[in-house]
Amino acid sequence: AQLFNVLKEAEAYPGPSLVIAYAPCINHGIKGGMTRTQTVGKQAVECGYWHLWHYNPQLEEQGKNPFVLDSKEPDWAKFRDFLLKEVRYTSLKAVSPEDAEALFQAAEQNARWRYEGYVRRSKIEY
């Protein structure tokens, strides 16, 4: 639903619009195959790997915050499990477990940092 709302909003905007979406691809090596892309996208949002938000400058004209965070608080406990459902991450873990661990932790820290920034931005009063 969020995607369709954002696409309608982008189309209605009287100027250029940009839509960025999480799109799993075959190179991610999704366990279970590419037929699971919708499920994987949903899991990416639930665990905090990907965040849903949109920015509509027209909201500012209405006295509203133009940045809207659509994602709920992620279930961070699922973050690592999400990574390990993709061959690109499990391959790294198999070849270099210590480096993989450090990178997995850094990825989660970065995802948390982004989410917290989005939460702060979404609470700005206009």
PLM features per residue range, with description:
Residues 1-73:
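Glycine-rich ThDP/TPP pyrophosphate-binding loop and its adjacent helix/strand module
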